[in-house]
Amino acid sequence: MSKYDSHLKCSFCGKSQEQVRKLIAGPGVYICDECVDLCNEILDEELLDTSGAAAQPAPKSEPPQKRRARSSNLSLSQIPKPREIKKYLDEHVIGQDEAKKVLSVAVYNHYKRLAILQSKGSSKNGADDAVELQKSNILLIGPTGCGKTLLAQTLAKILDVPFAVADATTLTEAGYVGEDVENILLRLLQVADLDVEEAQRGIIYIDEIDKIARKSENPSITRDVSGEGVQQALLKMLEGTIANVPPQGGRKHPYQDCIQIDTSNILFICGGAFVGLEKVVDQRGGKKSIGFVQPGEGQSKEKRAADVLRHLEPDDLVKFGMIPEFIGRVPMVAVVDPLDEEALMAILTQPRSALVKQYQKLLKMDNVQLDFKPDALKAIAQEAYRRKTGARALRGIVEELMLDVMYELPSRKDVTRCTVTREMVEKRSTAELLVHPSSLPKPESA
């Protein structure tokens, strides 16, 4: 036995030679007796399912999204048009027309690239085969709670390709504690049911991308493992490379089998708040004392900041902390507007899964009708706007407001209707709705 035998591990479960009864060696890999038994059980179950398939009823059909995602045949007639994509986004997300247009066009062009790649081998394309369509990754910039992540999540519901959402804050440079950038591809692979070919046609949304900006404009002497190091690691993935993805996630090690994924046809959408970026843009124009910094008439500070960001240039992102190579790989930039009080009121009631509709459905299950007076909705929107966390503040306010009612109603049979008023919103409590049972003369009509 060589001196290295004590360090041998199973390539599948990771157990060492001392922890198992038998370790079988192959060309560069090892498997223990426990994993062999597990593989035999899986094969026996599959053979049993296959032999009994004729006697079993037909399996349930997959959800439409899954069924479409497995289809690899794309034609131009089946591709949703940009207007159709935006119309669906309008049903779930309030405002943000510019960002919706950018996303709709990008997704539509992504579909067309996939359709062309599938028909590239046919001779009827003629001279067009020499024209290669390259992808245009997207960067969404906007304050917290304005709908960046919701746009991506809503987009995922209507796509015929796998869609994964990742968080940049958990990523670190290779060799350090944290997640490798390849774990982003693992999420996409899991959405595609481990179908590599399907995953290579997908779309990835990387949230909180501004959190990997380097800490200073000048290169640092010490390593920035969660900032510039992550940007460097993402470069080839964004542009297109063959990445080795560990199937179980985590760090890669020499004895691990990896899945190879070509990222050339994966569309990347990056989003972040980029707090303070508007100041960089303002300073470039020599407007340190004017523009959005000073209070003006008719516009909020956040709205003026969004207007300044519409004059954004790549150099501004470099000064913020993004490296030039990264910026060059996300050529499409869309600014997401902050939400004002009117937009927050619309978010409460208009979307298909609006917050008010959710609570009405919850109370309906207890046979109680829930109503919000217009001035109550306005008060909720005003408080959410004051908290400066965008639409995320709405749920916190309504949850706090409805706590007493939702605690008591399941045990009460004498309340059939609840009407929330502005006074209740200001008190942050709906407890008074439970004082007078509905069997008494209606107190709200008095």
UniProtKB/Swiss-Prot annotation:
Binding locations of ATP: P143, T144, G145, C146, G147, K148, T149, L150
Top-level taxon of origin: Bacteria
Is Magnesium there in the keyword field?
Answer: no
The protein's matches in InterPro entries, at most eight in alphabetical order, are given as: AAA+_ATPase (IPR003593), ATP-dep_Clp_protease_ClpX (IPR050052), ATPase_AAA_core (IPR003959), Clp_ATPase_C (IPR019489), Clp_protease_ATP-bd_su_ClpX (IPR004487), ClpX_bact (IPR046425), P-loop_NTPase (IPR027417), Znf_CppX_C4 (IPR010603)
GO MF annotations, alphabetized: ATP binding; ATP hydrolysis activity; ATP-dependent protein folding chaperone; protein dimerization activity; unfolded protein binding; zinc ion binding
Looking up PANTHER family in the UniProt record yields:
ATP-DEPENDENT CLP PROTEASE ATP-BINDING SUBUNIT CLPX-LIKE, MITOCHONDRIAL, ATP-DEPENDENT CLP PROTEASE ATP-BINDING SUBUNIT CLPX-LIKE, MITOCHONDRIAL-RELATED
Q: What's this protein's name?
A: ATP-dependent Clp protease ATP-binding subunit ClpX
Tell me which species this is from. Trichormus variabilis (strain ATCC 29413 / PCC 7937)
Q: What is the lineage of its organism?
A: Bacteria, Bacillati, Cyanobacteriota, Cyanophyceae, Nostocales
Q: Name the gene behind this protein.
A: clpX
